[in-house]
Amino acid sequence: MRHFLNINAIELDDVVDLVHRALAIKAGRSVIQSNLTVTNLFFENSTRTHSSFQMAENRLGYQQIDIDPQQSSMSKGESLTDTLKTLKAIGVDVAVIRHTVNNWYDQVLTATGHEIPHLINAGDGSGQHPSQSLLDLVTIYEQFNHFAGLNIRIVGDLAHSRVARSNAEILHHLGANMTFSGPKDWQPNDFGKFGQFVAIDDDWENLDVVIFLRVQHERITQTENQNFSTKQYHEQFGLNRVRYERLKAAAIIMHPAPVNRDVEIADELVEAPKSRIFEQMNNGVYARMAILEYTTEATHATH
C-alpha cells in the first residue's frame, strides 16, 4: 500500500513526475474523477493545508469525512492506530493527517500493516511537511524550469520548521546550491549535510530563490518568546526594501505562510512583483491533487 509521508523517501524521478503532473493539472489536463472516500484529521490548526487538501479532494470527486480529534473517540483515549483501523473498516480509503508528534506514522505503520487507509502526511511536528515541499518545488520549477544549479537560501527559524527540513534535503538532492541563514540558536547541526550556513547578506545578489520561514512561537521556549524582539529580528533576518532591491530581477521570494508581516517580510513586500507567496497557495491545490493521485495509484492521462 502506498503512502505519502516524507518527500525525501520517494524516488527523485517520482518527485519530478509529481511536479510535472501538478503543472499539467494546472494547465488543464484531465483528471479521473474518483469514487474514493477521504478523512482529513488535523491535530493542529491549519488554514492553507487543510483547505487546500479539501479543494484538491473536491476537484477529484472524493467523498469527504472531516473528523475533529477533540470530538472523536481519541478524546476518550483511543489510539490513532485504532482510529485508523476503524476508518478503514467503515470504508475510508485515504487519511490526510497533520499531527503534533514528529514521525507519528512510524508507530502506526509498525502496528497496523495494511489494515489502514492510504496515509498522507500533512505535517508532523517539526519533522516533515511533504505536501508543502512539493508545492514549493512546483512554484520553483514553474519559474525556472529546472532545479540543478539554482542558488536557493532558506532564512529564519530553521530549527522548528518542518518546511525547512523537507525543502533543504529535497532541493539539495535535486542539485540546487543550498545556503541557510538564521539566528545561531535556530541552526540545526544536521542541515550541514545539505548546504552551508552563511550571513544573510552574503552573495545576496546571486540568489535565485529566497524562502523565508515563519517564526514558530508555538514551538520555541517561553524564555525565547519573552526575549524575542520583532524589530530586531526583522532588521537582522527579515526582507526589507533594501534587500528586496538587491535581489536580481529574475529572483523570487517565497514563504510557507502564514506570514508575520513586518517580521519575516516587510508588509509592503508580501505581494511585491518578486513574491510568489500567493502563487504557492494556488499551486498547493494542484500539488495535492497530484499527491492524491500518486498515493492511490490512480491512472490519468499522460503529462
From Swiss-Prot:
<comment type="function">
    <text>Catalyzes the condensation of carbamoyl phosphate and aspartate to form carbamoyl aspartate and inorganic phosphate, the committed step in the de novo pyrimidine nucleotide biosynthesis pathway.</text>
</comment>
<feature type="binding site">
    <location>
        <position position="48"/>
    </location>
    <ligand>
        <name>carbamoyl phosphate</name>
    </ligand>
</feature>
<feature type="binding site">
    <location>
        <position position="162"/>
    </location>
    <ligand>
        <name>L-aspartate</name>
    </ligand>
</feature>
<feature type="binding site">
    <location>
        <position position="49"/>
    </location>
    <ligand>
        <name>carbamoyl phosphate</name>
    </ligand>
</feature>
<comment type="similarity">
    <text>Belongs to the aspartate/ornithine carbamoyltransferase superfamily. ATCase family.</text>
</comment>
<feature type="binding site">
    <location>
        <position position="258"/>
    </location>
    <ligand>
        <name>carbamoyl phosphate</name>
    </ligand>
</feature>
<keyword id="KW-0665">Pyrimidine biosynthesis</keyword>
<comment type="pathway">
    <text>Pyrimidine metabolism; UMP biosynthesis via de novo pathway; (S)-dihydroorotate from bicarbonate: step 2/3.</text>
</comment>
<feature type="binding site">
    <location>
        <position position="129"/>
    </location>
    <ligand>
        <name>carbamoyl phosphate</name>
    </ligand>
</feature>
<dbReference type="GO" id="GO:0044205">
    <property type="term" value="P:'de novo' UMP biosynthetic process"/>
</dbReference>
<feature type="binding site">
    <location>
        <position position="257"/>
    </location>
    <ligand>
        <name>carbamoyl phosphate</name>
    </ligand>
</feature>
<dbReference type="InterPro" id="IPR006132">
    <property type="entry name" value="Asp/Orn_carbamoyltranf_P-bd"/>
</dbReference>
<dbReference type="InterPro" id="IPR036901">
    <property type="entry name" value="Asp/Orn_carbamoylTrfase_sf"/>
</dbReference>
<keyword id="KW-0808">Transferase</keyword>
<feature type="binding site">
    <location>
        <position position="98"/>
    </location>
    <ligand>
        <name>carbamoyl phosphate</name>
    </ligand>
</feature>
<dbReference type="GO" id="GO:0006207">
    <property type="term" value="P:'de novo' pyrimidine nucleobase biosynthetic process"/>
</dbReference>
<dbReference type="InterPro" id="IPR002082">
    <property type="entry name" value="Asp_carbamoyltransf"/>
</dbReference>
<dbReference type="GO" id="GO:0005829">
    <property type="term" value="C:cytosol"/>
</dbReference>
<comment type="subunit">
    <text>Heterododecamer (2C3:3R2) of six catalytic PyrB chains organized as two trimers (C3), and six regulatory PyrI chains organized as three dimers (R2).</text>
</comment>
<dbReference type="GO" id="GO:0004070">
    <property type="term" value="F:aspartate carbamoyltransferase activity"/>
</dbReference>
<dbReference type="GO" id="GO:0016597">
    <property type="term" value="F:amino acid binding"/>
</dbReference>
<protein>
    <recommendedName>
        <fullName>Aspartate carbamoyltransferase catalytic subunit</fullName>
        <ecNumber>2.1.3.2</ecNumber>
    </recommendedName>
</protein>
<dbReference type="Pfam" id="PF00185">
    <property type="entry name" value="OTCace"/>
</dbReference>
<dbReference type="InterPro" id="IPR006131">
    <property type="entry name" value="Asp_carbamoyltransf_Asp/Orn-bd"/>
</dbReference>
<dbReference type="Pfam" id="PF02729">
    <property type="entry name" value="OTCace_N"/>
</dbReference>
<feature type="binding site">
    <location>
        <position position="214"/>
    </location>
    <ligand>
        <name>L-aspartate</name>
    </ligand>
</feature>
<dbReference type="InterPro" id="IPR006130">
    <property type="entry name" value="Asp/Orn_carbamoylTrfase"/>
</dbReference>
<feature type="binding site">
    <location>
        <position position="132"/>
    </location>
    <ligand>
        <name>carbamoyl phosphate</name>
    </ligand>
</feature>
<dbReference type="GO" id="GO:0006520">
    <property type="term" value="P:amino acid metabolic process"/>
</dbReference>
<feature type="binding site">
    <location>
        <position position="76"/>
    </location>
    <ligand>
        <name>L-aspartate</name>
    </ligand>
</feature>
